[in-house]
Structures are given as C-alpha cells and as structure tokens.
Amino acid sequence: MGKRKANHTISGMNAASAQGQGAGYNEEFANENLTPAERQNNKKRKKNQ
C-alpha cells in the first residue's frame, strides 16, 4: 500500500483519529505547560508510539 505516514507527525484533528481517542487531541495541547511528572510520562509515551 505504499509508504505509511507516521502518526506522530500529524497535528490537529487528524491526530486523534490516527492515534486513537484521547491520544492526539489531549496530548497535543498538553505539551504547552507540563508538570515534571507529566513530562516524564510524556517522554515514555512518545517513545512507544
């Protein structure tokens, strides 16, 4: 089927549908101001995607 687009590069509305409910939309905007604990969690999540 040709090359697949990497899901994590998509921003905006498409991110939620590509990554599953809650993954795209919530985490895109959570990056603005994270607590240290959230930042730790965010790094782990990004590696897994």
Curated annotation (Swiss-Prot):
Give the coiled coil ranges: none
Q: Tell me yes or no: is Zinc-finger among this UniProt entry's keywords.
A: no
Q: What is its main location?
A: other
Which keywords does the record carry?
Answer: Sporulation
**Residue segments, region Disordered:** 1-49
User: Biased-composition ranges for Polar residues?
Assistant: 8-20
Asked if the Swiss-Prot or TrEMBL record annotates the protein with the keyword Transport, the reply is: no
Q: Which domain of life is it from?
A: Bacteria
Biological processes, Gene Ontology terms: asexual sporulation; sporulation resulting in formation of a cellular spore
Q: Any one cellular component term from GO for this entry?
A: endospore-forming forespore
Q: What triggers production of this protein?
A: Expressed only in the forespore compartment of sporulating cells.
Please give the positions of the paired cysteines in each disulfide bond.
none
Entry's localization field: Spore core
- HAMAP family named in the record: SspO
Q: Which family does it belong to?
A: Belongs to the SspO family.
Protein's recorded name = Small, acid-soluble spore protein O
Organism of provenance: Bacillus anthracis
Supply the source organism's classification.
Answer: Bacteria, Bacillati, Bacillota, Bacilli, Bacillales
Q: Which gene encodes it?
A: sspO
